[in-house]
Amino acid sequence: MEFPVARNPQVKWKTGMLNEAEEMKDADFPEIRLFHVEHQLAPDGEKEDCVGKWVVCNPENLKDFSAVGFVFGRKLYKELSTPVGLIQSTWGGTHAESWTSMKVMENNPLYADVLKQYSKERVSREKDKCKVPATLWNGMIAPMVGYTVKGNIWYQGESNSVRYEKYQEVFTNLINSWRKEWNQPDMPFYFVQIAPHYKQPAGIREAQLKTWLSGLENIGMAVVTDAADSTDIHPRNKVAPGERLAAWALAKQYGKKIVYSGPLYKSMKVNGREITLDFEFAEGGLQTPGNEPVKGFFIAGNDARFYPAEAVINGSSITLSSTYVSAPVAVRYGYGTFFRVNLFNKAGLPAVPFRTDTFAPDTYYRLFADSEIRRFPEAWQLDHGKRLYFGYAQGVGCCAMLQVWKKTGDRRYFDYVEALSLIHISEPTR
């Protein structure tokens, strides 16, 4: 079987993989073969050929191969005992539009802005030429069209976060166009929801979630909230995304009776001051590591003021409440730039971040905290009486904070901290 490893920016082991030495001890697999497509820009049209060669899977050949892709292939091989081929076609820091055929984009208003901004005539810096629409489709994917593949794995989204409101349609169009080019209308497409990070808005992960839940056949999303690093958009934990992508393939394509997704929000019921949520993929019940208190839930009333919620697990459901919210109407879990969340199912897979509200995701919030904030704290104490630190964020999570000296009011520097309580305001105050 062959699986292309598409657009994963975290391609090289030498950039730092968690427990790399141990992983390399389990990296000799003569029946796993690797094909690494060399970088090739083609802004003027589709190429018929690309450069690369098949090599055996071993520690030396893996130095320049996708760690996530390798973990994915290794898991398939161990579970299925059958030869596996992995084709890596990747270029870090690129947009989904770079990997989409121009035939899809040229007459579609959805792409008008990016076609103008990144046209080959306007892009002069060498490092930006990979962002020209269709250039990587033309040079690194089109040459493989027609080659027999079992499916695709995809790890991308960071570079599209500035246009997250368009990403669901952009990504859906990419999937459908690849399937059409290969004449495989149900070709599997498994992707990683990008890890939470202080620079990444919640909207991009929400767009990925909506893509999964849109009704497209044979797609699946791996969640990596537990592997996230607030300061590194490319977390060093490559085993979690690789094995979770493999779980989708094993369950959906090979009929393995395994759990392939973490808890997914299903429904909500309000009862006075409490909200009870039910989840799918929660057979055997919900849990937290070491039965610690649940982190990451917020509730709000009609005023759109979200407060941390106390959470009580009851089997596959969870009940939320807050002393600050007397009539809750909305819930958010892990919905923000970066959050410490800890809800899992019995299979050890993390819950999917979500929100039940329709408040604008780019609404501004005023942040309140006490004067004891430290860099990257685990929590803040809600304190309306002290405003030594304040700032604005486009959602809950880890965000830029402007330090203001209490005595003089001087603004000194930005810091990155984790916000656990936000007060909604309609407009940012300058």
Predicted regions and their residues:
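Cell-envelope and extracellular/periplasmic
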Residues: 1-359
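Well-ordered alpha-helical segments within folded domains of soluble proteins
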Residues: 390-405, 430
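Short, solvent-exposed loop/edge-beta patches enriched in aromatic
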Residues: 77-82, 399, 403-412
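Residue-level detector of conserved catalytic or cofactor/ligand-binding positions
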Residues: 423-429
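His/Met- and acidic-residue-enriched segments that coordinate or traffic transition-metal cofactors
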Residues: 376, 380-385
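Structural helix-adjacent loops and short alpha-helical linkers that scaffold large soluble proteins
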Residues: 360-366, 404-418
